[in-house]
């Protein structure tokens, strides 16, 4: 509604923007060789840039239906999403927060992944280079018992830190 939304989550050269975006998406993926799954995905999205502030959120639903060849009669439904924000605390330094959630076991089973994260982005001047650092905590919640929660691990790290150098062109 306020013009074209730039495809960025913040840019130190565009700190006077006032943009907003709403989106709806849907897709149906049909397995052509009848080997795996037929999937339906639906989502909604929001993003906003207002001066030094960036906000974004997305929610999605997915239905996974197995083909006859897979010999699995069940279909599974999943919900997930995220909320994130960034704010330029200095001319080239952006602080960021993010919260993801996902019920990777399907809506029929208890258990959610909750993934809060904190990060910083530093934008180098005049070279389209960005240094990103993020810490993320992965929690498993909503299980019936502590044993169910412990068994729903799959080797996921509880704590992770990522540092990335990104060049755009």
For the regions a protein language model found, what residue spans apply to each?
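Extracellular loop and loop/strand-boundary signature of outer-membrane beta-barrel proteins
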Residues: 68-72, 104-107, 143-153
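Outer-membrane beta-barrel proteins, especially TonB-dependent receptors
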Residues: 8-17, 25-27, 31, 140-141, ...
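Residue-level signal for short segments within beta-strands and strand-turn junctions
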Residues: 61-63, 122, 137, 167
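Outer-membrane beta-barrel "beta-signal"
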Residues: 120, 124, 129, 153-169
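Outer membrane beta-barrel transmembrane domains
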Residues: 82, 86-140
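Transmembrane beta-barrel architecture of outer-membrane proteins
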Residues: 39-41, 78-80, 113-117, 158-162
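Detector for outer-membrane/organellar transmembrane beta-barrel domains
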Residues: 1-105
């Amino acid at each position: 509604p306020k013009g074209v939304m730039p495809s960025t989550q913040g840019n130190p050269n565009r700190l006077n923007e006032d943009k907003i975006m709403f989106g709806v998406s849907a897709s149906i993926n049909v397995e052509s060789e009848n080997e795996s799954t037929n999937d339906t995905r639906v989502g909604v999205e929001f993003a906003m840039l207002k001066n030094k502030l960036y906000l974004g959120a997305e929610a999605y639903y997915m239905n996974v239906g197995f083909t006859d060849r897979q010999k699995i009669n069940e279909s599974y439904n999943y919900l997930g999403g995220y909320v994130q924000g960034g704010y330029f605390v200095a001319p080239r330094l952006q602080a960021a927060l993010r919260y993801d959630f996902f019920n990777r076991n399907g809506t029929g089973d208890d258990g959610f992944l909750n993934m809060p994260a904190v990060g910083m982005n530093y934008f180098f001047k005049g070279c389209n280079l960005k240094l990103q650092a993020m810490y993320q905590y992965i929690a498993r919640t909503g299980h019936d018992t502590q044993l169910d929660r412990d068994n729903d691990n799959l080797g996921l790290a509880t704590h992770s830190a990522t540092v990335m150098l990104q060049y755009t062109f």
